[in-house]
């Protein structure tokens, strides 16, 4: 069994990680930490996990205890993994970080977007960006994995086939994305209150969202050149889900885009290219580690529209983290992740 530690188990990504690992046949959660909830039983905080983690209680983070684990997940706000990851890596423990701490390869760029100096720039050379559909082989050999964000996952998977094939104009990319309220986290905030978010929808961070440099970094690598991306996120009155509507222009309108996408993702267990003309729904991926994609070329012109949907807490966070765990430890990539989307 893989001995697992979790730092920061009280947020939405933390409890989703617990839910997924409870059904994983090769992983056992041995340590879970929370400074604010130390001493509280996991089953008392999350009744849905009763019978799965009996006897497991939250504890104050301790590097020695965490260092005895085979792998430690960080489901924490940015900056926390900076302080602990180095010590764990020195102890031989693998680190899978769900926060943004090691996603950007440029420490100065990270500091610009997150409002503080990068706390562990020396570790960036060891960090592997954990998008399996791009970096599977690097993940197998990794010590430190940076799990992609939710918007970046849906957006990159939607644009990748076009950019890798050199079909899309990389200077004219648009990502119009919608997120459920759980993407804002579990902390109390006026904008996340039911009376504020219910029956309403709004754009936010149009001037610049923290996920913009992460998305641009990935698309730049796919295109092999700089990209021009306009990214506009929106908050919608649902709990889970990301719906990304992506726009790109192509010079060659004779290419069979459906075939291109189907070929690119033919061997990817968690990317579902839907039949031509489809419109994927966020509810179809609720609770599932799946990205569903449909590609359109309206009126047969040079504008391509890609629709990409994920569950922000699963393929956009904790499910992708478990997918990385499976790859890292040489397991079947689908282990513990075979859940169908929850309907209705």
Curated annotation (Swiss-Prot):
This protein's GO CC annotations: cytoplasm
CDD domains: AGPR_1_C (cd23934), AGPR_1_N (cd17895)
Recorded superkingdom: Bacteria
Pfam annotation, one family: Semialdhyde_dhC_1
SUPFAM superfamilies xrefs: Glyceraldehyde-3-phosphate dehydrogenase-like, C-terminal domain (SSF55347), NAD(P)-binding Rossmann-fold domains (SSF51735)
Transmembrane segments: none
Subcellular location: Cytoplasm
Record-level Gene Ontology MF annotations: N-acetyl-gamma-glutamyl-phosphate reductase activity; NAD binding; NADP+ binding
Entry keyword set: Amino-acid biosynthesis, Arginine biosynthesis, Cytoplasm, NADP, Oxidoreductase
Record's function text: Catalyzes the NADPH-dependent reduction of N-acetyl-5-glutamyl phosphate to yield N-acetyl-L-glutamate 5-semialdehyde.
Protein name (database record): N-acetyl-gamma-glutamyl-phosphate reductase
Organism of provenance: Pseudomonas entomophila (strain L48)
């Amino acid at each position: 069994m893989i001995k697992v530690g979790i730092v920061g188990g009280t947020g939405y990504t933390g409890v989703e990680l617990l839910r997924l690992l409870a059904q994983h046949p090769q992983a056992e959660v041995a340590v879970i930490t929370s400074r604010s909830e130390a001493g509280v039983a996991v089953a008392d905080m999350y009744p849905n996990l009763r019978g799965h983690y009996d006897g497991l209680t939250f504890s104050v983070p301790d590097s020695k205890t965490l260092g005895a684990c085979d792998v430690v997940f960080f489901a924490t706000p940015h900056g926390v993994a900076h302080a602990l990851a180095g010590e764990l890596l020195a102890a031989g423990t693998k680190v899978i970080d769900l926060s943004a701490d090691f996603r950007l390869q440029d420490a100065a760029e990270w500091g610009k977007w997150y409002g503080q100096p990068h706390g562990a720039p020396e570790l960036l050379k060891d960090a592997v960006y954990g998008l399996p559909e791009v970096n599977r082989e690097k993940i197998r050999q990794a010590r430190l994995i940076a799990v992609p964000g939710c918007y970046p996952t849906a957006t990159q998977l939607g644009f990748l086939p076009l950019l890798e094939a050199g079909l899309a104009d990389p200077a004219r990319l648009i990502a119009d994305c919608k997120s459920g309220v759980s993407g804002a986290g579990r902390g109390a905030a006026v904008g996340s209150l039911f009376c504020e978010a219910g029956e309403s929808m709004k754009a936010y961070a149009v001037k610049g969202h923290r996920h913009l440099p992460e998305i641009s970094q990935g698309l730049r690598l796919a295109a092999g050149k700089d990209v021009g991306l306009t990214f506009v996120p929106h908050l919608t009155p649902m709990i889970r889900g990301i719906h990304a509507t992506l726009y790109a222009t192509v010079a060659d309108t004779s290419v069979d885009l459906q075939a291109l996408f189907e070929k690119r993702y033919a061997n990817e267990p968690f990317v579902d290219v839907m039949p031509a003309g489809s419109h994927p729904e966020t509810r179809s991926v609720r609770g599932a580690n799946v990205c569903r994609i449909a590609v359109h070329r309206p009126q047969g012109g040079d504008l391509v529209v890609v629709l990409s949907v994920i569950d922000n807490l699963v393929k956009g966070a904790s499910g992708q983290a478990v997918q990385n765990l499976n790859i890292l430890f040489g397991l079947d990539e689908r282990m513990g992740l075979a859940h169908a989307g929850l309907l209705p």
